Swiss-Prot record:
Record family assignment: Belongs to the bacterial ribosomal protein bL28 family.
Keyword entries, A-Z: Ribonucleoprotein, Ribosomal protein
Pfam families recorded: Ribosomal_L28
GO molecular function, one term: structural constituent of ribosome
NCBIfam families: L28 (TIGR00009)
Protein name per UniProt: Large ribosomal subunit protein bL28
Length: 74
């Protein structure tokens, strides 16, 4: 399953691990994703989304119906 937030569209980015001797090895930085169940009052059902912490704050602030939900790529 892809590691992409369904609200913000955040994805993993690449960077380097740096040792004490400043040797560089490639690594990936992953977004803080969680499966979370949200109540949709419009449809009176729960929706399970894979969202980042920032995506959860956006849902709390703006509401679930005002945000565009991106589909997960399988």
């Amino acid at each position: 399953m892809s590691k992409i937030c369904q609200i913000t569209g955040k994805k993993p980015i690449t960077g380097n691990n740096r040792s004490h001797a400043m040797n560089a090895t490639k690594r990936r930085f992953f977004p803080n994703l969680h499966f979370h169940k949200f109540w949709n009052p419009k449809t009176k059902r729960f929706i399970i989304l894979r969202v980042s912490a920032k995506g959860m704050r956006n849902i709390d602030k703006l509401g679930l119906n005002s945000l565009k939900i991106k589909k997960l790529h399988k």
